[in-house]
From Swiss-Prot:
Usually encoded in the trnK tRNA gene intron. Probably assists in splicing its own and other chloroplast group II introns. The gene is matK. Belongs to the intron maturase 2 family. MatK subfamily. GO terms for molecular function: RNA binding. One of its GO terms (biological process) is tRNA processing. It comes from Populus trichocarpa (Western balsam poplar). Its main location: plastid. This is Maturase K.
């Protein structure tokens, strides 16, 4: 009985009705919606070189060509003889990938909404981003012994990606069209490699291929998550309902509800999982307080699991196991810019576990992210916004653009940096970076009009500088609803953004 129950828990919830998505591919509004969404979303990457080519005429031509082909009988071997692929390959493929990304996300969005409603997750204005805190670094940070990191295995063949989607999208026509385009246009070696992943996402449709990649990784992680859950003696409501683990009172309130039901059994709920798992920037990171022997056993177990069950390439020699003490003062592997960008502070919270019982002081770790000024100045210098010591300079390559375009480019970079570091507690360095960008913008405009900075600022007034502030406020107003009860101070608080994917040298205009 216990084995059957475990097998049911291991099964992924795929009991949904069939999703017939293929007819939506021939709908004109799908491509219009995909294009508009890419223009309006707030991300750190630029939409490179595609806006000028987009038009409804091209969309209609694309749909007409697709209607003329019978994709149900086309295979990857004879796609070279297909007339559909003879003209505008890159443009057609990018448009179809954008449309397919919108269509294939529909069933997943419906599942997400239903899961949120069933779990009654509390809504919070405090959003998270790539720069937020990993949960295990707060409570269990001093007690972890070993850390193992390695690249996430990738499928040997493109067909594996299509087979994974078969579990979720049960529409043969859509999957056949997806298989056709993957075989025709894409090379597996450039699909999932960390060194080129950022440039790939910039040049191609990042949402589409990120969806394929996450689908693959989800299958790989599903077995591991099942094993992690078995380490608890009792089923526990995880703290994922709290978007920020520094909300200590929220955790205490939930703990009291469990604690008052059964004092004896609840003691077992305090048992920690045997291993902590993080997926970050194409890496699998395992942190545990086990012995080195147990960590090695887990290493080879995961290697055999991936090679035998998922048919993926997982090389054991590329998985490194080191004492966690080596990483306690350096968080480079977690994506932070340097060891100085993370600070470990102790917060004391006084709580009362039971009514009329004793009071106790709970000491918890709180990690604060800071803005590292030296790496940011290095990035600005590399992009020719300032020199090596941080003095602003003009950007000659942008002098040929219009004034509004130049200002928009600088404002966009400032907004991206504000989004990325908006959850940091100390932002003085961020204000200095904004000052460098503002002055670089003024120098670029003065260079274009063959004037000095002083004369140009005197003629333009303070309107230019206001652009760098009002743009950020408008973004924040879209997240937090305006109300009389919400003070302006709320907009200046720490905000995590969910839509940040990566930061690629601040901008990608060239």
């Amino acid at each position: 009985m216990k084995i059957e129950k475990s097998q049911r828990n291991l099964e992924i919830d795929r009991s949904r009705k069939n999703d017939f998505l293929y007819p939506l591919i021939f709908r004109e509004y799908i491509y219009t919606f995909a294009h508009d969404r890419d223009l309006n979303r707030s991300i750190l990457l630029e939409n490179v070189g595609y806006d000028n080519k987009y038009s409804l005429l091209i969309v209609k031509r694309l749909i007409t060509r697709m209607y003329q082909q019978n994709h149900l009988i086309i295979s990857a071997n004879d796609s070279n003889q297909n007339t559909f692929f003879r003209y505008n390959k890159n443009l057609y493929f990018q448009m179809i990938s954008e449309g397919f990304a919108v269509i294939v996300e529909i069933p997943f969005s419906l599942r997400l909404v239903s899961s949120l409603e069933s779990s009654e997750i509390v809504k919070s204005h405090n959003l998270r981003s790539i720069h937020s805190i990993f949960p295990f670094l707060e409570g269990k940070f001093p007690h972890l012994n070993y850390l193992s990191e390695g690249l996430i295995p990738y499928p040997i063949h493109l067909e594996k990606l299509v087979q994974i989607l078969r579990y979720w999208v049960k529409d043969p026509s859509s999957l056949h069209l997806l298989r056709l385009f993957l075989h025709e246009y894409w090379n597996l070696n450039s699909l999932i490699i960390p060194k080129k992943s950022i440039s790939f996402f910039v040049k191609k449709n990042q949402r589409f291929f990120l969806f394929l990649y996450n689908s693959h990784v989800y299958e790989y992680e599903s077995v591991f998550f099942f094993l992690c859950k078995q380490s608890f003696h009792f089923r526990l409501t995880f703290y994922q309902v709290f978007l920020e683990r520094i909300y200590f009172y929220g955790k205490i309130e939930h703990f009291v509800e469990v604690f008052t039901k059964d004092w004896g059994d609840s003691l077992c709920l305090l048992k920690d999982p045997f291993i902590h798992y993080i997926r970050y920037q194409g890496k699998s990171i395992f942190v545990s307080k086990d012995t080195p022997l147990l960590m090695k056993k887990w290493k080879y177990y995961l290697v055999n699991l991936c090679q035998c069950h998922f048919d993926v390439c997982f090389q054991p020699q590329k998985i490194h196991i080191n004492p966690f003490s080596l990483y306690k003062h350096s968080f480079a592997l977690l994506g932070y810019l340097s060891s100085s960008s993370v600070r470990l502070n102790l917060s004391v919270v006084r709580s009362q576990m039971l009514e009329n019982a004793f009071l106790m002081d709970n000491i918890m770790n709180k990690l604060d992210t800071t803005v590292s000024i030296i790496p940011l100045i290095g990035s600005l210098a590399k992009m020719k916004f300032c020199n090596a010591v941080g003095h602003p300079i003009s950007k000659p390559t942008w002098a040929d653009f219009s004034d509004s375009d130049i200002i928009d480019r600088f404002v966009r970079i400032c907004r991206n940096l504000s989004h990325y570091y908006s959850g940091s507690s100390r932002k003085k360095s961020l204000y200095r970076i904004k000052y460098i960008l503002r002055l670089s913008c003024v120098k670029t405009l003065a260079r274009k009009h063959k004037s000095t900075v002083r004369i140009f600022l005197k003629r333009l007034g303070s309107e230019l500088l206001e652009e760098f502030f009002t743009e950020e406020e408008q973004i924040l107003f879209l997240i937090f609803p305006r109300a009389s009860s919400i003070s302006q101070k709320l907009y200046r608080g720490r905000v995590w953004y969910l839509d940040i994917i990566c930061i690629n040298e601040l901008s990608n205009h060239e």
